[in-house]
Amino acid sequence: MEAQSPMSTLFIFVIFGLIFYFMIYRPQAKRNKEHKKLMSELAKGTEVLTAGGVIGKITKVTEGSDSIVIALNDTTEITINRNYIVSVLPKGSLKSL
């Protein structure tokens, strides 16, 4: 049995490192960056979808806090953590439901 050279072993580790970087780390970092951008753009009047499937309109955003208030209809409001917002909906989405 022939022993592998140290360079070929190092080459294999470098290949696995590159695969890990481009297949796992980089896409996740990109998603995190997009989510942070989404969180910074939240404002009063924005229609959002939460992780629990709740759709509502933001009525209050507190900058110092992680919580926001969402109006589900004219009489019901809930307070949630801003990290549970999954996506921003187009204007008028609530009226079309």
Swiss-Prot record:
Record key words, sorted: Cell inner membrane, Cell membrane, Membrane, Protein transport, Translocation, Transmembrane, Transmembrane helix, Transport
GO annotations of cellular component type: plasma membrane
Segments forming a coiled coil: none
Broad class of where this protein is predominantly found: membrane
Stored Pfam families: YajC (PF02699)
Membrane topology: Single-pass membrane protein
Matching InterPro entries: Preprotein_translocase_YajC
SMART domains in UniProt: YajC (SM01323)
Subcellular location: Cell inner membrane
Membrane-spanning segments: 5-25
GO biological process: protein transport
Known partners and oligomeric status: Part of the SecDF-YidC-YajC translocase complex. The SecDF-YidC-YajC translocase forms a supercomplex with SecYEG, called the holo-translocon (HTL).
Family: Belongs to the YajC family.
Function noted in UniProt: The SecYEG-SecDF-YajC-YidC holo-translocon (HTL) protein secretase/insertase is a supercomplex required for protein secretion, insertion of proteins into membranes, and assembly of membrane protein complexes. While the SecYEG complex is essential for assembly of a number of proteins and complexes, the SecDF-YajC-YidC subcomplex facilitates these functions.
Record's protein name: Sec translocon accessory complex subunit YajC
Originating organism: Haemophilus influenzae (strain ATCC 51907 / DSM 11121 / KW20 / Rd)
Gene: yajC
